[in-house]
Amino acid sequence: MASDRPTLPPVRLHSDAELAREALAAPLLVRAVRLARWAGPETRVGAGGELVDEQLPAAAEVLGLADDEDGEAYASEAWRVAVDTGLVDVHDPDDLGDSDDPDDSGDSAGAEGGSETGSETGTVTAGENLALVTGGAPADILALWLDGFETVFADATAPYVDDLDALVGEDGTIDFEALDWDPEGEAEFLEGVLGNLYLLTVSEGGPSGGPVPLPALAASMVVPDDMGEPTDAVLEQVSDAMMRLDEQFRILEPIGLVEYEPVDEALMIEEGAEGARPTEEFDEEDVSRYGMVRLTPLGLYGVRARMLEAGLVVPAVGELADQGAEALLDGIAHYPQDAARAETVGWLEGRPAPAAALELLAAARGADPGAPLRRLHAQQALSLLGPEAEPAVRAVLDDPELGGLARVWLAEHGAADIPAPPEQMIFWLAVDTIAAHLDADGDIEELQDLIEGLTGRHGGFFDNVWRVEHPATADVLEAMGRLHRDKPSAKEARKAAFKARSRG
């Protein structure tokens, strides 16, 4: 009876304009822009586009980080983002030899670069994307920010190297095998973590924008779903994953992806050789010491963009506004209630009520397995329309599929002259309504209340309902036999289901 379900709930994104403002305020992008504006003819870079060591102090000073012991590292990180996002263009050192100006020699270039020789340093110019910072559309800003996110993601999955010289071979190349680093595995791990954090954020009943404890996030990547009490070995893996994530979220926070409260360093010292393993029971204050993280609105946008690029179906509230009623009703079929209403309200805002009502009613027809839920959502959408929709609703009073919901709408809106429904329409609507709720996979107790309310309202319900010409009659009666809390009524439902199937 159920149609294909979306793998992820819909996300409510901020507008592009709001997200663009958030992107421009991200600390790392702010630093990258500042360095791009600072860079000039005397700026020298290495073969990989990195600032030469001698220029890092000046770059740190531009960022106001001259007195910070990590200032040069922050400057180097911001410069990489400036290069990778096109805020600056790097000109390869080899290109310098093509200059026609005899005074534009490698030696003069190297004077500013310190230990680098002229033949080893390149130059930079302002990149085309620098102008987008002040003159670009929101979509341009977000594209630039996504490029920065890619750079930071790569940094977060890169191995920590304490002594790079020890990894450089005699031929000058880095021995990556000695790092014991699996780049694909590292990227897959972080993708999985961000995916789980995204799901926790958008799921109904999730943290509703609140922070997620780092132990819970680490456990979601390590502890098997069918495991009861985690073993010591698994807890050790959770501890290792927490430490790994602590480093990665510290790297991801400056680009504006997450808000992160790091693991308490004092806790790491307290734990000593055992690692920062959370105890079995701890209060709310204890949990925060193990790290707390949440995706920002910009982070939701960024993670969703990566998922879309990977080919996943990642719905967002509002993306159905320009589509037809059939796409709307199919699209929101398994949305959480609040998201379905928000999507519907947005869809209705762009249409006159009479036209919207006609389109919704036309899309609600059908005998396919998803039709009952489409009709339920059509009825809920119609309930948001005023009296302007009445002519369209009255036009389907005699329709065997829509006549019942039309009468419900008219009654709810206090209309006069509502014709009494034929008895078969009453039972057909009951079957259709239960079929829709079964497909929706809603709260079981609410469904039981609905079933018992419908059966109690009509005398001889099971003596009549099995004759209803509805594709889901037998399935609905079988479900009623399972769910009805009154045993005699449940038995009647099962008998009626047998009759419906025997009738063919």
List the model feature ranges, each with a label.
Residues 1-110, 114-155, 159-234:
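Short, amphipathic alpha-helical interface elements at domain boundaries
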Residues 69-84, 237-264:
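Short amphipathic alpha-helical interaction segments
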Residues 219-222, 330-331, 341-351, 373-385, ...:
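Structural detector for internal amphipathic alpha-helices that build alpha-solenoid repeat scaffolds
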Residues 249-251, 325-326, 354-366, 386-397, ...:
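Amphipathic alpha-helical scaffolding segments comprising HEAT/armadillo-like alpha-solenoid repeats
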Residues 251, 257-318:
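C-terminal engagement modules used by replication, chromatin/transcription, nuclear envelope/ESCRT
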Residues 263, 319-320, 327-335, 359-369, ...:
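Alpha-solenoid HEAT/Armadillo-like helical repeat scaffolds in large eukaryotic proteins
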Residues 321-326, 335-342, 357-358, 368-377, ...:
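Generic helix N-cap/helix-start motif at coil->alpha-helix transitions
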Residues 346-348, 411-454, 460-461:
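Alpha-helical adaptor scaffolds
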